[in-house]
């Protein structure tokens, strides 16, 4: 049914410097400086190239939808292979919220609308609303959804796979 592999952060750490304080809201560290963030993204890209040599990846999905202004600027300036950022359409604390557009720096802003393999009525409503508004369907699945009981692992792979197939047919 198609699909695309993208980058989802180095060690699931958002691209944020020490000027961001997550407090008790998110369990993340910040990067010491921009050079450390840049090194992490380079390593992430090399890992992707080594792991999937025949796949061209161009989408960056911020961990927990968090992407600081400094991190966003660094991606645009230093990583031309990243041509799309897929974060969040809906607001949330620390979220990098997007509209569907091409930014002034040329990066495509393409928010994700739904995610996971537990497709409930809210997800269907959100997906249908987006289809009506922009004629777009965007869905994201975390690789570790298969291991996280809160995100469907308790259902088992066959049920999760069936849910995704049913969603695509829907």
Q: At which residue positions do the language-model features occur?
A:
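C-terminal active-site subregion of NodB/CE4 polysaccharide deacetylases
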Residues: 75-170
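Metal-dependent polysaccharide deacetylase catalytic core of the NodB/CE4 family, i.e.
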Residues: 1-70, 134, 139-147
